[in-house]
Amino acid sequence: MSSKFPLGVRFITHSLPCTRLASMNSGALIYSFRSVPVLSKAFPFRLKYIGLGSRVNFSTRPERSQPEFARRSGAGGEIRASKSLIEDEAELSDWVSDLRTSSLRGKFTSDEDNADPEVVRRNVDRDTSRGPRRGREGQSDRFGGAKRGKEGEMDRFGSPNRRRTSGEPADSFGNKRLGDREGSRNGRVQGKSSESSFRGRSDRNVDSGSSFRGRSDKNVDSGSSFRGRNDRNVDSGSSFRGRSDRNVDSGSSFRGRSDRNVDSGSSFRGRNDRNVDSGSSFRGRNDRNVESGFRREPGSENNRGLGKQTRGLSLEEEDSSDDDENRVGLGNIDDLPSEDSSDEDDENDEPLIKKAASAKAVQTDKPTGEHVKTSDSYLSKTRFDQFPLSPLSLKAIKDAGFETMTVVQEATLPIILQGKDVLAKAKTGTGKTVAFLLPAIEAVIKSPPASRDSRQPPIIVLVVCPTRELASQAAAEANTLLKYHPSIGVQVVIGGTKLPTEQRRMQTNPCQILVATPGRLKDHIENTSGFATRLMGVKVLVLDEADHLLDMGFRRDIERIIAAVPKQRQTFLFSATVPEEVRQICHVALKRDHEFINCVQEGSGETHQKVTQMYMIASLDRHFSLLHVLLKEHIADNVDYKVIIFCTTAMVTRLVADLLSQLSLNVREIHSRKPQSYRTRVSDEFRKSKAIILVTSDVSARGVDYPDVSLVVQMGLPSDREQYIHRLGRTGRKGKEGEGVLLLAPWEEYFMSSVKDLPITKSPLPPIDPEAVKRVQKGLSQVEMKNKEAAYQAWLGYYKSQKMIARDTTRLVELANEFSRSMGLDSPPAIPKNVLGKMGLKNVPGLRTK
């Protein structure tokens, strides 16, 4: 009768060593067996404690010399006497004491590291043999990466490291011990020991073949090499940084090779193969859908929740609502949750406010040689070094490519440096941001350092911007100017990010300069502990785009902010226009002896002076086809086209973007219903790209600098004359030429009387090919019904706010239903009764309710 034993029982074999014969050599891998103490066989721990086991040589070069193993890897094997019980107990005691200080990593050595017995001993004790040394490339890090010059020795994952003594523990993954991770689901699964040990032993149904180079074979459940932990059903060989997700055919090797459909593959050099959604490289970049970094946290599943810290940059983990957004490729834009319902959607907008990332965002402001030649109208001959600025600031200005000042900077800087308040009227796109940032930085430099006892250092400069895009752009430019001022920090607080995240960031990072939008700044004043106290240290207050701040209804918030900062301060108001509302706020914000600087001379053209302007009048049912024809003609004439299309509302913006996407155009969209991180990414992509179309609402109308925009199309009625001018100002920036087209319906033509003084001419309609009409109709039929319904409702609400049109509500509803038919709908969508009540359109004929 056969006996059955539990799976956990292991028979105790004799302790006498087995002499190996020459015929037992296995080739490349030579296993040296020795006597195993009796207590170790009875000890209740399993493969994770392999300190008593033999060292395994994973050599791929068996012909190299191996001094330490030479005496026991020969044909004769190893002969030694059995150990006594006392020796066993002594060895066990030493091993247990090692448990307290070591990370329990399996001890295996690389052949190249075995040349010297002393080196071998030191490498085994400190677990330094993780990869082959790299010849003349300098001291290699733990995984074979060459250390770079005097940038500081790097540990195995790129963080600064000092030379350890042999007695110190050599931890990895942010000094997390392997023993701390035993609580995760990697490990024993349903009674199986799938610990992917360094002995190369495989569990049941597991083909362990993860090699020292991280190779991954077809249908191989490999025990991930180095630190890769093997999950159930994981085809993984992810080494160094590769994440091991379930059912992922991964093979991210030591050089970052990546198979298709790999969601990790973050390579040592940061290379990305197709369908790879990551690439967090050694330089600290964090691309979308990557939650990997330099530290592996204990108990993390599939390596989620990993953060990284490089050169002081702290990337927070994205929250779940951003995960859905990250799955949306920019080439195929889907609808995302509105900001109204998920205002705290994510925190991934931080890269734009970090010094390492700011240079890219600001390079568009560099006056290149071409700019200098074509933009004499706004550049002066005055150099920055003619003013008493910090040498480090001047060095950063030179690195940024600025040589001479703009007219705005030349006019405002001397007065501001004298300590006076300033109201400056200037053309859009002429360097207003640098004009107020440079003197603000000088104010920070001259301020006495905060006392060491102060837990919350004061905020010295407060910049208030009307939109998130403007705030992010201003913060990026500030970081560029602060390139050689490492002790001065810039933080940005804007809607669309979590309030606790911003609170944490301001507490842990330097924040002498704060850039904010009014609503979020008010939130911090009311809800952040100690924030109001920090604002009492403000010495410089800047209101950027002051006219726009007031147009957006922020007057009460601005008054609240002004009351929260000291009266003894210096204040700058910069604006493209100075209407009566701005003059009124001047009495509250500025001192009586403030200077008004008008950089727009009478008779000189505005930014749009070199922009060819035209308008077209067509019925609503022809607008979409007409837009398609205009775009096709412009693309045919301009290889490096860059087009911005402005729409009346966010939902109409989404509709137009969906339509153009169906027509196979390279299109992106930005509007208030998109999460802030999405808007930041798309804005940055559009800024750097060519041959691209951006469909946007008025969030991109002011101040945002997109270089080389060749065409601006405005679909529908602008809210007013100033909005038309600001939209048009996205092209023709910095002296370059551009083109603007305003597309109106016949009943919107009254708007032209407000811009009759501008050089805008009426253009005949281009011929529309019937085939183009069919393509547009087909594209509209493929747009989701919910998007059409939302666009109809938003369109109705927008034109209800236009007094000239909203006077006759019956006529307004007829026009809305005409817009509905232009989208290809037979009948207008139903609108909830409560929404109609808020619009003031209850019981109006022609509306359907639900």
Swiss-Prot record:
Acidic residues bias locations: 315-325, 336-350
Key word Ribonucleoprotein present: no
Residues bearing PTM Phosphothreonine: T109
TM region(s), chain numbering: none
SMART domains on file: DEXDc (SM00487), HELICc (SM00490)
Phosphoserine, modified sites: S110
The Helicase ATP-binding domain, residue ranges: 413-596
Keyword annotations of the record: ATP-binding, Helicase, Hydrolase, Nucleotide-binding, Phosphoprotein, RNA-binding
A GO-annotated cellular component: chloroplast
Region listing for Disordered, in residue ranges: 60-82, 106-350
Catalytic activity: ATP + H2O = ADP + phosphate + H(+)
Superkingdom field: Eukaryota
Residue window of motif Q motif: 382-410
Any one GO molecular function term: mRNA binding
Amino acid composition bias (Basic and acidic residues), ranges on this chain: 61-71, 118-140, 284-299
SUPFAM superfamilies, per database record: P-loop containing nucleoside triphosphate hydrolases
Enzyme's top EC category: hydrolase
All copies of domain Helicase C-terminal, residue ranges: 630-777
Keyword match Phosphoprotein: yes
Motif (DEAD box): 544-547
EC number(s) reported in the record: 3.6.4.13
Binding-site residues for ATP, renumbered to this chain: A426, K427, T428, G429, T430, G431, K432, T433
Family in the record: Belongs to the DEAD box helicase family.
UniProt note: domains: The Q motif is unique to and characteristic of the DEAD box family of RNA helicases and controls ATP binding and hydrolysis.
Protein name, entry field: DEAD-box ATP-dependent RNA helicase 26
The species this protein was found in: Arabidopsis thaliana
Gene label: RH26
